[in-house]
Amino acid sequence: MAMGVSLTSHNNPLLRHLSPSSSWVSRSSSRLSSSPLPSFLFPCRRTLLQRKLASTDGNVGYCTTTVCQGFQHSVHQRSSSVVFNGEWELRSESNKVRMVPKIIKVGNQTEVAETHQVPGTVSAWREEANKLRERNGQIARNLDDNGYFNGSVPIISSAPSYETSQKIDYEFKPRGTTRSTTATLNKELIGITQSEPVVSLPRKGLDVGDNMDVNPKGEGIQRPLISDKSSGTANGNKNTVAISKVERSTEPSNVRENLGKIYDKVLIVDNVQAAKDTVAKLVNQFRNHVHSCDTEVSGIEVKEETPVDHGELICFSIYCGPEADFGNGKSCIWVDVLGENGREVLAEFKPYFEDSFIRKVWHNYSFDSHIIRNHGIEISGFHADTMHMARLWDSARRIKGGYSLEALTSDPKVLGGTQTKEEAEFLGKISMKTIFGKRKLKKDGSEGKIVVIPPVEELQREDREAWISYSALDAISTLKLYESMTKKLQLMDWHLDGKPVLGRTMLDFYHEFWRPFGELLVKMEAEGILVDREYLAEIEKVAKAEQQVAGSRFRNWASKYCPDAKYMNIGSDTQLRQLFFGGISNSHDEVLPVEKLFKVPNIDKVIEEGKKTPTKFRNIKLHRISDSPLSTENFTASGWPSVGGDVLKELAGKVSAEYDFMDDVSDISLEEVVEDDDVETSETQKSKTDDETDTSAYGTAYVAFGGGERGKEACHAIASLCEVCSIDSLISNFILPLQGSNVSGKDGRVHCSLNINTETGRLSARRPNLQNQPALEKDRYKIRKAFVASPGNTLVVADYGQLELRILAHLTGCKSMMEAFKAGGDFHSRTAMNMYPHVREAVENGQVILEWHPEPGEDKPPVPLLKDAFGSERRKAKMLNFSIAYGKTAVGLSRDWKVSTKEAQETVDLWYNDRQEVRKWQEMRKKEAIEDGYVLTLLGRSRRFPASKSRAQRNHIQRAAINTPVQGSAADVAMCAMLEISINQQLKKLGWRLLLQIHDEVILEGPIESAEIAKDIVVDCMSKPFNGRNILSVDLSVDAKCAQNWYAAK
């Protein structure tokens, strides 16, 4: 629908502040472009002036000042609480006013210039239609029959109060003509908001939420422009136009009315006989249909608890499409399993859910599957997960829009073209808060601002009709979403290793890869992994004791300069900032006082002056402990110096927390805290570090505290503070979560949720996040030891070697990298040798060797290893190998290395000298991302990018365009390897099961006696993951070990 308008001044004095000067009216005109444009947007034909207003109901409201060519009356003014995306005009006729939509002429066609959505009820539309019929004898069909009415809008004298949007044909007569013209006004959900008169063509790929630059046109005279405020002018002659989404009306009364339409189509199954009859139809009459299913659950904190062995199924719904009739026009099934005979009713559906022939579609299959499995039913016939289909269609929605059923079905881009007129009124999942939310009562009985939702069991019993409709809508929306995603994926070509797969689409990819992968992930979640909770409890004691020691060490050091620091809260950024940066000014010229009082818990029961007994809290005075404020380049959003981990590490440098002032720091003994002698203390606590003589390892605090012993002491003390933070992270993120009952089932195994919800396709995990285990060198408490095999079993842990670098070598066709991988050995040492001539010369002269494989009895190499003799060069080579694969630039590397950008660029150029294919490939991907808006992985999954609006965003897109094919292709390889392992019949017969995938490694569990056989099979599956082949131009290196716990297998 065309979106052209023209601009004039207002006759209404209340609206004049929205217009430019009344002496200036744009007369610019241009033809509509014949070039292909997005279906939801056409170029502006005339000028538009809109001003964004505040909203009272959470929707976006607009006031528009515009008039159609041929009319001379100002636009109708809407209130700010109304979603208004169109243009109306008030026409004066015999002292009465008639509201008509604005039109334009395009050739011989007359079109409504814009679209709108106005509030009201269906009955209000029907009433106006009947009035029209009575007055003019024209046809006005009942809106319940999906109709619309013809004729002029009824004469009105004030703003209408409709609360729904319908497709309506209007008849009107443009000024100066005698012939009536009919135009159709359709409800649309996309519109333009602009803050100045413009004529512009939208860019390719314009999307909801995007901005585009526009230029004012007209008579070439610069005029004041309306800004986002009620007064003021826009700067310059360019402004931003935001493409905005107009939401459906979510007034509770209107929502419930629409839900009522669903209720009439729902068959309620709440007894055993009805269950038997329904199941008979499902497995026979409608056996060949696609069935969408959804559950409703009580007794579970979804964001905190695993659904494995948690949650109680209270009802579920099944929908096979509108053509499936279960009697009296009922097309959707809603099953009540909350009542007294609920378990018996559910048991009748067991054959249905376990029928592998019946194709079942779910939204978030993982959750529903575990909930139903909790009741002794193993689901078969998994056909699709619409959440995964949507992620495959557009991986960028994770950041903007999301993948919830509500977000997807409310988005016109997602369901566009798959809805009937009637479905458009109610399809689109509505949040529970909108339907069932009630304002929490205050103590005085009045309503507060907080909206709460009653327990779902209460809703099912007491608000039954609305609850049934809400539940059934999930299944209906899921099937419509499946139909839409099926069509969208069918329109996406499938590319394998950069080449199109003839006659195949991404829907084929989904069914061949992501559908079985999604089912495999659910099985892995159900398996879980056993954790040794006794071990976790023991290392928790050790960690807390070491944290207490490190904290006391820091406090006692700080108290030498500020006595009250002994009582400070070292977890408070405010107190630490006062201690390190007191007296400094921020970017807003606000000064942090040199000293300040803080209230802290009175742990030592100190009786303050003037008090007779100790109070719960006491005041302490903190002041800056250095002679001058410490320097830093890191600041918070408010302009104050940051005291985060990076800043503290910069102050401390690369020194140990251990120092000879330990003796007078604390009398806490680890042996007193940890009673079990078998528990190992951390490596750093076992031994003290010798006093360094080389001051280059010390941080900026060394100079700030005058150097010498005083400066060293400061750095070691701040390192102790870093240790406190590090230990706290290990306790809160790893040790404690693994012990929680919320993440484990009845068998004591941890069941995390595995998700394909990253933009590259990498797996993520939550409840708990097992993907985020600490690096081995930072795992001071050996947390991986807690992941163990059950009695009689063992673990096989298999890990890819340098997977992403091998992917990069294949994608780019880089000969140097492929030769290095073919030669084997230390890849990073070979990179350093190729980068630095002096390193190569040392290797060629035999002064160093790349790697060494000792023979029995040999304890050291004949000459130094390259990694020992040229450690600095190798470290830079290693960093570059990974950084360039991730799209990092010389600017970022200069910050990491603390060198100039020029020096970093010179090192980067050394890396590229022998790898020109990589640079060429990267430039192609950058261009592809900007011009086409997406890049592809090895198996053809796409990552979309928005149009870049700034240099920073463009740089981010270009880095992602380099990283995504590498990291996404690595995810493709890992997925294929897991599928190969899962279908291997020998592993199944031996009793081996996949438990986890953590980045590039997989963990399996099975009988001890077949461990070596299983390990060899796993290595073979991973090295040839593509149906028993390796399609890459480099070998896939796999290292595997058998052990009783994860740590021992590393």
Swiss-Prot record:
Catalysed reactions, as listed in the record: DNA(n) + a 2'-deoxyribonucleoside 5'-triphosphate = DNA(n+1) + diphosphate
Places the protein is found: Plastid, Chloroplast; Mitochondrion
GO molecular function, one term: DNA binding
Region (Polymerase), start-end ranges: 717-1048
Classification via SUPFAM superfamilies: DNA/RNA polymerases, Ribonuclease H-like
Tissue and organ distribution: Expressed in shoot apical meristem.
Compositionally biased region (Polar residues): 228-240
Covalent S-S links between cysteines: none
Tree of life domain: Eukaryota
Region span, Disordered: 202-240, 673-694
Alphabetized InterPro entries for the sequence: 3'-5'_exonuclease_dom (IPR002562), DNA-dir_DNA_pol_A_palm_dom (IPR001098), DNA/RNA_pol_sf (IPR043502), DNA_polymerase_A (IPR002298), RNaseH-like_sf (IPR012337), RNaseH_sf (IPR036397)
Residue ranges of domain 3'-5' exonuclease in the record: 312-490
SMART domains linked: POLAc
Location (main, coarse): plastid
Enzyme Commission number(s) from the entry: 2.7.7.7
Presequence boundaries: 1-91
Gene Ontology cellular component annotations, sorted alphabetically: chloroplast; mitochondrion
Record's keyword annotation contains Hydrolase: yes
Observed phenotype of the null mutant: Retarded growth and reduced levels of DNA in both mitochondria and plastids. Double homozygous mutants polIa and polIb are sterile.
CDD domains noted in UniProt: DNA_pol_A_plastid_like, DNA_polA_I_Ecoli_like_exo
Keyword Metal-binding part of the UniProt annotation: no
GO biological process, one term: plastid DNA replication
Family the UniProt entry places it in: Belongs to the DNA polymerase type-A family.
Function text: In addition to polymerase activity, this DNA polymerase exhibits 5'-3' exonuclease activity. Required for DNA replication and accumulation in plastids and mitochondria. May be required for DNA repair in both organelles.
Name listed for the protein in its UniProt record: DNA polymerase I A, chloroplastic/mitochondrial
